[in-house]
Regions:
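Active-site mouth loops of central-metabolism enzymes
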Residues: 8-25, 105-110, 163-169
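Glycine-rich phosphate-binding active-site loops on the catalytic face of alpha/beta enzymes
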Residues: 13, 88-100, 129-141, 166-194
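Acidic (Asp/Glu)-rich catalytic clusters
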Residues: 28-35, 60-64, 99-102, 121-124, ...
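Glycine/Thr-rich beta-alpha phosphate-binding loop at enzyme active sites
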Residues: 81, 85, 108-155
Length: 194
């Protein structure tokens, strides 16, 4: 179904345990079996301690399947757990020192405008997620930014850009995003329901 890429289009799984019909760790294992580019552990409602506990378990599963695990928001936990990939909101990334950034080999940043994309690249981001591209239940009531936005972001930065928001297991959608210059897409709902 996934196998890391469609042609060269890369798929990153984004977690949301509230969307799972089965145990979350079982769902992570199912996701790893379809071989995504990476798994972003994005559980925004957890406390730092709860996130640390869950991150250890998810990293173990990802390591078993040799799928990169990217920790979200809690960068100090990533350092503590020796996870070298992290995904951050731009406001958190802005305050990281150069020394703190050096602790990671990959830093992804969520952006919602061309200006944010340029700033994130200047600050040293490895890749960006830009969105939301399509209508999604996660952003109910908010109109999607669309493919034109994605194209503009991809044109203005030289680092890899992944579309996020309403992305499905849909080759036509992937082709459209690839034509905009995106290297891949991030799937949440579809990944939590496979």
């Amino acid at each position: 179904m996934c196998n890391r890429s469609y042609h060269e289009f890369k798929i990153i799984a984004v977690s949301n345990r509230k969307l799972c019909d089965r145990s979350f760790l079982e769902q992570i294992e199912r996701v790893c079996k379809i071989d995504p580019e990476a798994v972003i552990l994005r559980e925004k409602d957890l406390t730092e301690e709860e996130y640390r506990t869950l991150a250890k378990e998810v990293m173990e599963i990802c390591n078993h399947y040799q799928i990169p695990c990217i920790l979200h928001r809690f960068w100090k936990i990533a350092v503590e757990l020796e996870c070298t990939a992290v995904h951050l909101p731009l406001p958190i990334f802005r305050v990281l020192s150069d020394e703190e950034k050096k602790k990671f080999t990959k830093i992804g940043i969520s952006v919602h405008s061309v200006e944010e994309a340029k700033e994130a690249e200047q600050l040293g981001a490895s890749y960006l997620t830009a969105g939301h591209i399509y209508a999604t239940d996660c952003k109910k009531g908010l109109p999607p930014r669309g493919l034109e936005f994605l194209k503009e972001v991809c044109r203005e930065v030289s680092i890899p850009v992944y579309g996020i928001g309403g992305i499905k297991f849909d080759e036509e959608q992937w082709n459209d995003m690839e034509k905009c210059g995106a290297v891949g897409g991030c799937i949440m709902s579809g990944m939590m329901e496979i």
